[in-house]
C-alpha cells in the first residue's frame, strides 16, 4: 500500500539505506544495488550504442573488464585517457561523448585526479561525469560537491567496513539522472535485496 507495492521497485529497508547514502554524499537521491558491479552495470546502461565514454587510464580491474568485455560489445565507444593531463581530456571529448568515468584515488596505482577541473570541462561540453568514490568514502571526499554528476560506491568495502555484506550505490543530485537511474535499477533488477 502507498509508496511501496513491489519490492524490486522499492521497499522501506532499501529506501532507508538509499536516503542515508545520499545524505552522506550530499546528494538528493541514492540508489542501493546488489553489488558494486551492479551499480556500474546500471550506470553504464545510461549509454547507448554509438555513445562515447571517456575513462581514466588507471582503474579498478572489474570496471576495465565490464567496459572491454560488455560495454564495448554493445557498441559503446570506450577511450582511455590520462585525466591527470586536463588538456588531453578536453581534446578527447567528441560530439558523441556522453560520460566521463573517473575514480580517485585510482585502483591500483592511487592516481589523484582533479575532480573539480574534470567536472568543469565536462559541464562546458554538456557531458555527464561519474566518480567511483569507493576508496575515500564520503568521509574524505564528496564528488558531488566538486561538480561530479554521479557518485559510485562498492559499499562492500569502506562504507560497510566488515566485508560481511555485498553492495553498491549510485548517488546523484540531478532529477533527470535520478529518474533514469530509478527506471534502470527497477528494469535491470540490480537493486539491493531488503535483507542485505
Which sequence ranges carry the predicted segments?
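Conserved PLP-enzyme active-site core in the AAT-like
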Residues: 29-196
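A glycine-/small-polar-enriched, mobile loop at the entrance of the PLP active site in fold-type I
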Residues: 1-23, 28
Amino acid at each position: 500500500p502507498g509508496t511501496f507495492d513491489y519490492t524490486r521497485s522499492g521497499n522501506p529497508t532499501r529506501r532507508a539505506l538509499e536516503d542515508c547514502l545520499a545524505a552522506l554524499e550530499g546528494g538528493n537521491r541514492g540508489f542501493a544495488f546488489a553489488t558494486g558491479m551492479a551499480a556500474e552495470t546500471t550506470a553504464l546502461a545510461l549509454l547507448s550504442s554509438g555513445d562515447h565514454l571517456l575513462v581514466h587510464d588507471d582503474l579498478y580491474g572489474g570496471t576495465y573488464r565490464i567496459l572491454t568485455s560488455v560495454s564495448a560489445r554493445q557498441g559503446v565507444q570506450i577511450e582511455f585517457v590520462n585525466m591527470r593531463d586536463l588538456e588531453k581530456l578536453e581534446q578527447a571529448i567528441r560530439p558523441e561523448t556522453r560520460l566521463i568515468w573517473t575514480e580517485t584515488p585510482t585502483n591500483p596505482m592511487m592516481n589523484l585526479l582533479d575532480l573539480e577541473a574534470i567536472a568543469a570541462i565536462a559541464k562546458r561540453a554538456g557531458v555527464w561525469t561519474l566518480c567511483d568514490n569507493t576508496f575515500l568514502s564520503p568521509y574524505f571526499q564528496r564528488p558531488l560537491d566538486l561538480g561530479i554528476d554521479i557518485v559510485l560506491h562498492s559499499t562492500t568495502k569502506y562504507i560497510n567496513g566488515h566485508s560481511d555484506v555485498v553492495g553498491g550505490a549510485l548517488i546523484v543530485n540531478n532529477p533527470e539522472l535520478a529518474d533514469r537511474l530509478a527506471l534502470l535499477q527497477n528494469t535491470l533488477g540490480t537493486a539491493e535485496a531488503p535483507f542485505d
